[in-house]
Amino acid sequence: MKDLLNLLKSQGQVEEFDSIRISLASPEMIRSWSFGEVKKPETINYRTFKPEREGLFCAKIFGPVKDYECLCGKYKRMKHRGIICEKCGVEVTLAKVRRERMGHIELASPVAHIWFLKSLPSRIGLLLDMTLRDIERVLYFESYVVTEPGMTTLERGQLLTDEQYFEAMEEFGDEFEAQMGAEAIQTLMRAIDLETEVQRLREEIPNTSSETKIKKYSKRLKLLEAFHFSGNKPEWMVMEVLPVLPPDLRPLVPLDGGRFATSDLNDLYRRVINRNNRLKRLLDLNAPDIIVRNEKRMLQEAVDALLDNGRRGRAITGSNKRPLKSLADMIKGKQGRFRQNLLGKRVDYSGRSVIVVGPTLRLHQCGLPKKMALELFKPFIFSKLELRGLATTIKAAKKMVEREEAVVWDILDEVIREHPVLLNRAPTLHRLGIQAFEPVLIEGKAIQLHPLVCSAYNADFDGDQMAVHVPLTIEAQLEARALMMSTNNILSPASGEPIIVPSQDVVLGLYWMTRERINAKGEGMVFADTMEVSRAYYSKQVDLQARIKVRLTETLIGAEGERTSETKLVQTTVGRVLLWEIVPAGIPLEMINRPMVKKAISAVINYCYRVVGLKATVIFADRLMYMGYDFSTKSGSSIGVNDFTIPAAKADIIARADAEVKEIETQYASGLVTQGEKYNKVIDIWSRANDLVAKSMMEGISKETVINRDGVEEQQSSFNSVFMYADSGARGSPAQIRQLAGMRGLMARPDGSIIETPIKANFREGLNVLQYFISTHGARKGLADTALKTANSGYLTRRLVDVAQDLVVTLQDCGTDSGLTMSPVIEGGDVIESLGDRILGRVVARDVIRPGSDEILVPAGTMIDEAWVGRIEEMGIDEVLVRSPITCESRNGICSMCYGRDLARGHRVNPGEAVGVIAAQSIGEPGTQLTMRTFHIGGAASRASAADSVQVKQEGTVRLLNVKVVSNPAGNLVAVSRSGELAIADASGRERERYKIPYGALITVKDGETVKGGQIVAKWDPHTHPIVSEVAGTVAFSGMEEGLSIRRQTDELTGLSSIEILDPAERPSAGKDLRPAITLVDAKGKELFLANTNVPAHYMLPAKAILTINNGDIINVGDIVARIPQEGSKTRDITGGLPRVADLFEARRPKEPAILAEISGTVSFGKETKGKRRLIITPTDGQVLDDGSTHYEVLIPKHRQLTVFEGEMVAKGEVVSDGPANPHDILRLQGVEALARYITNEIQDVYRLQGVKINDKHIETIVRQMLRKVEITTMGDSSFVKGEQVELTSVLEENEKLRAEGKQPAHYERLLLGITKASLATESFISAASFQETTRVLTEAAVTGKKDNLRGLKENVVVGRLIPAGTGLAYHNDRKRRREEALSEQVGVSAEDVEAALTEALKSSVS
């Protein structure tokens, strides 16, 4: 009995481990795992179904087929446990040992492991310093390799063909040795002395000048060091013994009809064994060399196929022409071991069904069909039935449940009470896709879902299905209730705004009841209290929308929680009073006393959560919903065709637009405007017409004229159903109403360019055939886009989660005082995001001081909450330095001060919060809402008619920001820089508006001038790109030959001639090399220089440019030399939507990036090469640069427009040539903060366009993970190699140690890695391997003998432990503490202690 108990105890024990190591297996190790050698290719006997002896399923090697039974049947049952049968040699034990016992195959000739050979970079190749081609020629018996040169002229590792080998034999006899095949490779690897090689390379690297050589050496050095330190031996990459997988992991299952279903591995193993046995026989027979060689090659190929089929040559196929699934295929890919079984598992105790709406539920409830509940809670019911004595055995209980006896239902009610269940809707894009509810039993078969959680699940009731899961353990129930309950998830973790917000019909009801109607029944009545109002309303004495006065009490809650009440008489409507009755105390009346559109309702719920508290908010949200449904039913709003009133002005507007278009067509016909200009202008006209129609239509729908009490006509907001739907935010938008009642407007072709002829009809009038055909393009593209988008968005989320999964809040405070400077986002005349919104929920890094004094306004370490935001807005502060995840100095994880507020809870983030995963989900979840399309410039024109001037909105002072200007004779400024901006500051000096000023714009004000609202301060022609002269002088042409490089055109109407530069493609061969340009000369014909420089005033003219001046004309400063039609100058596609977000996170370099100044200094131009210009920057202080030169130079293609002139001063990181920014350059030249700002702003732009709110800190969290690695620039006394990529934390740790010992620390440069690269470069090989490129990651990890400390979430999921985040953090901290205690207590244990412990254990086990 004791035996049995011990056996059971040993079965249940879990091994505790702290890390996992992966390394190469030596032949001895493989033999030690093995339980015997597999010698025959047979599997099982097809008559008796018994495994063949010494075959692939042999019971002697792998264990018995049936529990406690040997193969021949001599020993059966438990009592013979552990005996080895003398007849058949099988140990009597559990059959499940066939899942863990391995065998082996002794190979007759060594075989190279294909992973270390072919997975790039080839490890064997690096080690032997040979190319992969050469090694393959040796391995597959095409040439000899010299393994021991002896005293000859040959070198070790030299390849010899057959002829060369025989010649060498004749010449040197047996002075030297040359071999072929894997043995040769093995011999070469044995000969390597790791230590001396490492020493040699370490000395060689500093003495090498060529970059490529250093790269090669440091790669090889890294590999050699890895072998040296990990204890792996290089020759183990060639196998002499092949392990055999346990048979139950490659099963052979008999099907009916005498056929077998088998794992592909068995076929692959059979080939290996067959070839191996044949090779053994050939060697015994001393067969001719050529035959043996062929057999060895075939063995090598068979083993290759077993390990990784298809990696080399053609994949071996089975009987059905399908490639066989090798060991490598088992672990990689979506269906592989990692992603299918370790990271994604099926869940027991779950069910799924269609969802229907449950408008009567409370927020924390869901309706669960009785049938489902009975099935899901079966074990609980069984135990209750037994406990009550209603059933004697489980079997009897089962019977009762199957018969559905009455008592079972009573027990089910009890079991379910206060037992939450989890509801999940696929796709689970963020953590709100799984929430906990208390089940309410219902009849029927559909799950009832509370309407307010639909937006979190993104669910609708058109046939969606949801899954139910039952948390079994008490801990799971507790977590479900405390963390996952729908009532605890009011705020969205992405933006911190409420996500439990009424939508659609509820909004419509609340909006309708809070509207005013002039001259409704009971208008002007005065009531004593709210009760009287509802009595009057329900007895039909007063209308719901009537304006009345009522006396009510308003309670307000201050910042410290103190309550103040005030009773007053207020002007309001009946509906608003009814709504006021359900509003919790503490909410001001003015939040309710207005038409409740969706935004207003959201604001009330948000305020309620922040000020009144969670419980009140939940109750309030529920009551809002009930009331909304009630009144939307009473409103009886519906749509008829006549609700879409077509504006009277429409015909007139369209006629005017048509006339304008005709005008432009005639201009085009007579050659006054180019094709591109015509296209742009036409589209502009129609965009404007469309907007006008829409405006007049909305004016018609949104207002109605009524007679008021005094019999006078008065305008009020209309009660048109369509208008109410759109205005309340319930459904539809002005853009959709425009298509129904205005005009459909311009349509896009499938490639995104806009068709010139708009659809003038609307849906109420109906489309004709042509119009319908045009509009099908867009509809189809929309559907195709959606399908592609979903997959792309899912992949982006997966990469984001993978890169950020191990980022958890571990510390309270890392103590840093660095951070990011936050300022408001201003575009054009609007503040898009105020400073308050940006810093809400952040911690201030340093004291904010009032400008011009030393008064501290906000002390460092303050968490900015809503109250502080109000104060900061009043103080007129322009920017605040806040702590950020990017600058957090915690070694692993992140501290809660740098992260700030937990957005979903509204207080400071708790240690253990998995902020990385939350960030990834918040960015990935709205991915499906982003567009896939790339906007062409034409598309941009359609979105807004092209801007051609800057009109100021409010009064203020002008600030010109990095604009270079020249002033023309009229005294106006002309902008000659491309990235200039003009800002307007208000009286207190805060920036309120900001506009981009394009090249060639006329600026009519000076810097610092005061302007009034509505004043136009700059204007330009939006359809052409000018080239502006910066000096006055005489025009001299060069490279302008008529008919070769230019074409003269004379206008019939005006008689003016213009010159057009031909595109090189259109020129005759003689003109191909001409470079048309204009030089400005003085009266004597000498070249003029640009002001204060020695750069000639020389303008290259691009193709398609149009000149209106002639050779010898005299021009002034600021005059336009040439115009380039806008479509002619290179229009860059603006990548929008999802691809743009992916590009930013992958840190991709754009095609033609902006060129930045690498150092600060003076610009000059060197000798030009063909097609390139040489830009030279000389440091002003004359210091010598790192590489020893006195200046920095870069070659820039001629077609790039430069923004700097000779002699100009540039600062490091300033733009020299325009283009999209390259994030790597920003990091290198401007630092981490500039990079963070760039990436955050760019990504926010994309999301903002779609109206998605995401908090900046999620993006910063991902950027932190992208900045984990550094590149070593100088080694110092560290163990790092120059040019090596290392984790930042490990460099910091090593440098600390070196400084403590007074040695030289290593210097490094921060690196920016794309999210895919960063995921693959994590410390943890388990996490990287389960992400992508499994083979490569595992190969590298094995060679370097990597140890995975299981720090992240993914690794712990894979090994099946609690994750070190959330509630699992306590378990991990506890284990850490126990480990430390154990280390400190490792003092000897006496024999008596052991004995006492044993007796104690036995006692407890017997009892």
From Swiss-Prot:
Binds 1 Mg(2+) ion per subunit. Binds 2 Zn(2+) ions per subunit. GO terms for biological process: DNA-templated transcription. GO terms for molecular function: DNA binding; DNA-directed RNA polymerase activity; magnesium ion binding; zinc ion binding. Disulfide bonds: none annotated. It is an enzyme of class 2 (transferase). Its EC number is 2.7.7.6. Gene3D superfamilies: 1.10.132.30, 1.10.150.390, 1.10.1790.20, 1.10.40.90, 2.40.40.20, 2.40.50.100, RNA polymerase II, clamp domain, RNA polymerase Rpb1, domain 3. Zn(2+) 1 binds at C70, C72, C85, C88. This is DNA-directed RNA polymerase subunit beta'. It comes from Cellvibrio japonicus (strain Ueda107). The gene is rpoC.
